[in-house]
Structure formats: C-alpha cells, structure tokens
Amino acid sequence: SLFNLPSLHVSDAKVIGQIMQARTVEKTIVYDFMTPWLGTGLIVSTGSKWTQHRKIITPAFHFKILEDFLVIMNHQSDVLIEKLKTSANGTDCNIYNHVTYCALDIIAESAMSVKLNTQQHPNSEYVLAVKEMTDIILKRLFSLFREYKWAFQFTKAHRRQRELVKVIHDFAYKVISDRKKQLYSDAQEQQRAQKQLAEEAVYGKRRMTLLDLLLNVTMDGKPLSDSEIREEVDTFMFTGHDSTTSSISFTAYHLSRDASIQQRVYDEILAIVGPDAKTVELTYGTLQKLKYLEMVIKETLRINPPVPVIGRRSVGDMVIDGVTIPKGLDFFIMIYLLHNDPELYPEPTRFDPERFSEEASVKRPPYSYMPFSAGSRNCIGQRYAMLEVKTVLVKLLANYQLLPCEASNQLRLKTDMTLKPVNGVFVKLVRR
C-alpha cells in the first residue's frame, strides 16, 4: 500500500496491457491536484467531455498542421543555437535551462500564437508562475496528507496557489480575448474568417494554432466557452514543454558520452539534410527520413522515460491476469521499471539505439515500451513532440560537437511530475 491506501505497482507488460485496455479504470486522485490550474482540460477530464475534446483537438496534430509548427520550431531552435555560442568554451555547459526556455517559446507560439521570448527574457511573471505552480503540485503529490484535500485550503501553499493561478489564468484569458479581436473584429470579418476556414479546412495553408482551432469549433452546435478554451490552452502549456525539454537534454547527454553513436547521427544529418544543415530550414519530410536519429531518441526515452510512472484507479471490480481486483484500488504503472526490465531489454543500462531497429522492435510484446503512455488516453501530442525533439537536436548537432562533462557533473535523476535532472544536464560544446 501507499500512504496506508491500497495500491498495486505494476511493471509487467502483459498486466499493463490489461489495465490500459480495461473500461473500469480512470485516472487517480493525483490528477485532481491539477484542476485549480488546468480545470477539466484534456489531461484531467473523463467521460463524454474527454471524448468530445479529444476529437476536437486531434486535427491540430494532423501532419499538415505540424508542418506549419515547424516554422516555429526552426526559428526558436536557431535562437537556442545562438544563445549557446557563449557556452561553447570547453567548460561544462548546463543545457537544461536553455532547452527549457526554447521549449516554452515553441509551445507558447504553437498553442497561443504568443511570442513569450523566454529565451531572451526568462524571468517573466507568467513563466515564473508556471514553474512555481508545478512545484506546488509536486509537493502535494508527495505529501503524507495528499488524500486529505480539504486540509490544503488552510495552508500558505494554498494562498500562494491562488495567486499563481490568477496570474496564469489572466494571461490566458487576455490571449484569448486578443485573438478573438484579431479574428472577429466585426461581423463582416467573422464571416470572412469562417468562409476562409471552410475553404481551407483545418488542414489548409493558413497556420492554425491550437487556440485558433478551439475558437472555430462547435460542440453540440455551440462554440466553446472562454473557460473551456483556457483549460485546453493551459493544459498544452503544462504538458508541452517539460517532457520535450527532458527528451532533448537527456539525448544530448547520452550522445556526448558515446562518440561513435554521435558521429553516426551527424553523418546521417549531413547525408539527408545536406552540407547546409547548420542553417537550413528543416521540413517535415526531411525529419521523417532521419531514422537513426529517431532510434537514438527512442532509446533515450526508454532509459529516461519523461513520465516514469502513471496512475490509474479501478472504478469497479475487474479481473486482471485471472485475479479479481476490487473497486477503489490504485494502479501505479512503473514505466521506468518496465523500460529497464532485462528480459525485455538485455543490459538495460547500456545505451543502444539498435534496440529500436524495425527488426528488434517487432519482437517485443505490446505495452513493453510506452514513453507516451498507451491506449486511448495516450499522449495526443506525441508526433508534435518527436518533431520538436528532432528539430532541436539536428540544429544542435549540426552546429556543435558534444563532449562528456566532468565526473562531478554526471547526470543524476529525480522524479518530479516528470523525470528530471537533479542539478541540470551538462555537456561540453565545441563549435563545428
């Protein structure tokens, strides 16, 4: 049990598959801690609302829309490369914060059409509020009193949470209001915008952000309320930078420690992107061809899964692997342990991208690899995330050789809401 409450920790792929496919499970109480900030956005909602909103948001990740997002990813990656120049001096560089600010700028512009410019101005009120709000949720998650939600209202953290939520929500509502004015300055403009959307559909030439999509859809014949839109925008800001930051940083770290694998990735970049890889605008088609880089990223996500554990709760009696599971039991699906199971991945601590060749992948059972969760509630933005990770890494490796850091700065991990470094992710950068 955990905190004197019944729970089952699972790392067996067969059992995980049965849990993820069951109709009598929902997310655990942990996700309730996010509702003051995220409301009932996609990561928290259940039932018909989740089904409807998932259907509404899915078109935002059609490959035609992803091609438009690549314009943003390319630009912000170029800003990152420029910022790193001052750190390419032979000493250890903590790339984690740099990548965090880059990822925030990418998701803000993709989701809201807002240029946060976090890479230039990392101490904005909104960015700091997002960071602190995440910390409060984390502390509640590991509190001995986490099941007693009523007690939280009497704490200093609750008062601070209310202040932070106001900052974050006010920012989002202002963005929604400003975007509405841009799209619908008057009735004639509204008709013109709707006609253009109808002609181009969701997949047309017009760059469609998540916010634009939400402003132009209807549910049961009615537009979404500002509150519903804000919930989904906040959800994407919350989920859209942490995991990509870790994936990019951890991949860079592993490459810095294996010169032969790094050289093979670099050779692939030169062969497919071309000799101008340092500055060329990366396209969807080009990134899809970088198969070895994708294998490297997948191996990083195996060793360092962004979300090392996910929770589910049984809402009715169920049978798992022949055993009756009572209503109210919490399942903790241990993705980190699953990904480091020596029966699935021999010598699991060894970094080996060949595990994700087509031949090797098909031999593993279902649910043996799930860095983006699995089942119907898997990560809706996983293709977006993979494109972003590839884009940043191509730019990084085209411009810099990565060398290992000093022993004192070797990677140490901790489990927050995602898997994070204790003191940062350090590499040495050498300009190519």
Task: Give residue spans per PLM region.
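Central I-helix of cytochrome P450 enzymes
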Residues: 103, 107, 112, 164-172, ...
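Cytochrome P450 heme-binding "Cys pocket" and the immediately downstream C-terminal segment
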Residues: 259-261, 382-420
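Conserved cytochrome P450 catalytic core segment spanning the I/J/K helices
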Residues: 62, 164-248, 278-286, 290, ...
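Conserved, non-catalytic sequence blocks in retroelement Pol enzymes and Pol-derived host proteins
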Residues: 61-69, 93-94, 159-160, 201-203, ...
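Cytochrome P450 catalytic domain signature, combining two hallmark sequence patches
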Residues: 16-36, 52, 345-346, 359, ...
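Conserved cytochrome P450 K-helix/beta-meander segment immediately N-terminal to the heme-binding cysteine loop
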Residues: 333-361
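Cytochrome P450 catalytic-domain helical core, especially the substrate-recognition surface
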Residues: 5-6, 13, 31-112, 124-181, ...
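Cytochrome P450 heme-thiolate "Cys pocket" and heme-binding signature region
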Residues: 59, 234, 239, 359-389, ...
